[in-house]
Structure formats: structure tokens, C-alpha cells
A protein has these predicted regions:
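Acidic/polar-rich alpha-helix caps and helix-coil junctions
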Residues: 1-161
Length: 163
């Protein structure tokens, strides 16, 4: 099945939100062609407060709280740095936590299996974990720049632009 974080991050067809079933299929009340509807079939759910209505007719009395920095980000930053400096399993007296242990703490919190790969495959696992765990938290742009992989990702983003 899918990574359980997917369902905590987005709403998709058939999900319930604010006591209403999402109908993002073509012809559905939330589908393409409906004013303000999704064009992808998905809506962002991460960090949204279901008790706050954004309808223009409702008063906004409850605030949305957006998290700036999370422990998962600290662990992923550490895993990336340790892997780049030494390797996935390096530890010493000053660095008792390995990159693998840090990465797998994040995965365990999401009920995902541990990563056992090494070398370039481990580096790719760290990068994928950042993409999934930190989705919609404004990290991806900076990750792409830091990793210097813009040439590999450019085609993905350009395919989404219709002028």
C-alpha cells in the first residue's frame, strides 16, 4: 500500500473533510471544472484545522498554526550530513547516532520499515524521505539546489506548466 503519510498530507476522492465527502472525480462537486476545485484530484490536508471554515461567509475565530521546525527535520538534516561526511553507519564518541538510526527514527514514527541500504542507495533513501516527510513544508526547492539536481528535476516541473 501507500505510505501512511500520504493520507495525512492530502485529501483525495472519497475522503471526508468537514463532514463532507470529497468528490474530486470529473463531474463531482470538487472535480475539475468546478470553480475553485482541484485540477490534480488532491487537496492539501497537512496542518489544516478541520474546524476552521475558510468560506467567505464564516467568521475566522480559530487560527491556523503552522509548524516552522520539526524534530523530524532535525533528524533528516543530521542523517544527510552524517551520510555526506562519513557513511550511513558511522558513529563515534561525539556522534553516537548514525545517519541510518536518525533516518529510521523518522520512518518508525510513520510506521514505515527501516532502511537497510548503503552507499548511493542510502543517500537516495534520505532524499526520498525528505521529500515525503517534509512535503509542503517549503524544503524541496532548497533541497534541489543543495543537491545540485535541478537538471534532473526540471522536466518534471516544466511538464506541469501550461501557458
Amino acid at each position: 500500500g501507500r505510505d501512511p503519510r500520504f493520507y495525512k498530507t492530502v485529501l483525495c476522492n472519497g475522503d471526508t473533510w468537514m463532514n463532507s465527502t470529497i468528490q474530486s472525480y470529473e463531474g463531482g462537486k470538487d472535480g475539475a471544472g468546478t470553480t475553485g476545485a482541484t485540477t490534480t484530484g488532491y487537496y492539501l490536508k497537512k496542518y489544516m484545522n478541520e474546524t476552521v471554515s475558510l468560506a467567505p461567509s464564516n467568521e475566522k475565530k480559530k487560527p491556523h498554526h503552522f509548524i516552522i521546525f520539526r524534530y523530524a527535520e532535525i533528524l533528516l538534516n543530521y542523517a544527510e550530513a552524517m551520510d555526506a561526511w562519513k557513511d550511513a553507519d558511522y558513529t563515534d564518541n561525539d556522534h553516537p547516532l548514525s545517519a541510518r538510526a536518525a533516518l529510521n527514527q523518522v520512518r518508525a514514527a510513520a510506521d514505515m520499515p527501516a532502511i537497510t541500504t548503503s552507499g548511493d542507495a542510502f543517500t537516495e533513501s534520505v532524499r526520498r524521505e525528505r521529500r515525503v516527510e517534509l512535503a509542503f513544508e517549503d524544503h524541496r526547492f532548497w533541497d534541489i539546489r543543495r543537491w545540485k539536481i535541478g537538471d534532473k528535476t526540471k522536466a518534471i516541473y516544466l511538464s506541469l506548466i501550461h501557458i
